[in-house]
């Protein structure tokens, strides 16, 4: 997967503008960036810029929306391979989240920190997606608690803790570090399973069909 520096190269037209906005917002912060900064970095005129986007808020929305969709696609791809076990499902979405936050730090930080700059209509869409993300973790943890393999007495706190620590990776992870993304993801899987108090041996047996009552002995006494 290409690093962030490689994604900074100019494309053509709409792609170049979006890429320039990603870099400008990431380096300066959304509030400090003007539409002229983005056009200059993309190597296009303002008229070309407005042909594709109405302004920098529209660009932010495109970046946040695209990042959110890519993140959910990665979580879905991982979870579909995890089977029905809540422990494996939680490991899958934690792994996908950490990898995405580490490999796409610019996009992740924009999504996690600049969403307040969206319009009211755009915020509604963002909050729906945010709710879907929360529900994904919530349903997995609730299933594990119901089955008796997640023993935490505080599933909501565990969910918030897991999501927060995974999202925070985008703020501090650097590719030049000694630890690979895969190693980091596996360590966070271990931490997440500790938070939910994963006990696979404690799975509650599913109720089986009732055994038929024994037939009465109708033989005559000797």
Language-model features and meaning:
Residues 109-112, 152-153, 203-205:
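Short, hydrophobic secondary-structure boundary micro-motifs
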Residues 69-76, 121-147, 156-160:
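Amphipathic alpha-helical packing segments from all-alpha helical-bundle domains
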Residues 16, 20, 24-58, 62:
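Helix-turn-helix
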Residues 102-121, 138:
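Amphipathic alpha-helical segments used for helix-helix packing
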Residues 1-2, 96-99, 103, 134-143, ...:
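C-terminal peripheral helix-coil segments that are non-catalytic and often amphipathic
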Residues 56, 63, 67, 71, ...:
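Hydrophobic/aromatic residues within well-ordered alpha-helical segments
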Residues 62, 76-106, 159-162, 201-212:
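Hydrophobic alpha-helical connector segments
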């Amino acid at each position: 997967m290409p690093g962030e520096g490689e994604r900074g190269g100019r494309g053509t037209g709409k792609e170049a503008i979006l890429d320039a906005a990603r870099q400008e917002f990431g380096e300066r912060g959304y509030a400090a960036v003007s539409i002229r900064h983005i056009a200059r970095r993309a190597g296009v005129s303002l008229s070309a810029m407005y042909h594709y986007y109405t302004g920098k808020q529209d660009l932010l929305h495109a970046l946040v929306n695209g990042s959110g969709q890519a993140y959910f696609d990665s979580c879905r791809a991982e979870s579909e391979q995890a089977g029905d076990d809540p422990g494996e499902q939680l490991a899958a979405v934690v792994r996908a989240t950490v990898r995405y936050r580490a490999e796409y730090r610019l996009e992740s930080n924009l999504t996690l920190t600049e969403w307040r700059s969206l319009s009211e209509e755009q915020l509604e869409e963002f909050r729906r997606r945010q709710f879907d993300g929360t529900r994904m973790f919530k349903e997995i943890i609730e299933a594990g608690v119901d089955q008796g393999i997640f023993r935490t007495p505080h599933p909501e706190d565990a969910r918030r803790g897991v999501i927060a620590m995974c999202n925070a990776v985008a703020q501090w992870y650097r590719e030049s570090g000694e630890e690979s993304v895969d190693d980091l993801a596996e360590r966070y899987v271990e931490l997440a399973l500790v938070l939910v108090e994963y006990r696979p041996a404690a799975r509650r047996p599913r109720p089986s069909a009732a055994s038929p009552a024994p037939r009465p002995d109708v033989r005559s006494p000797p």
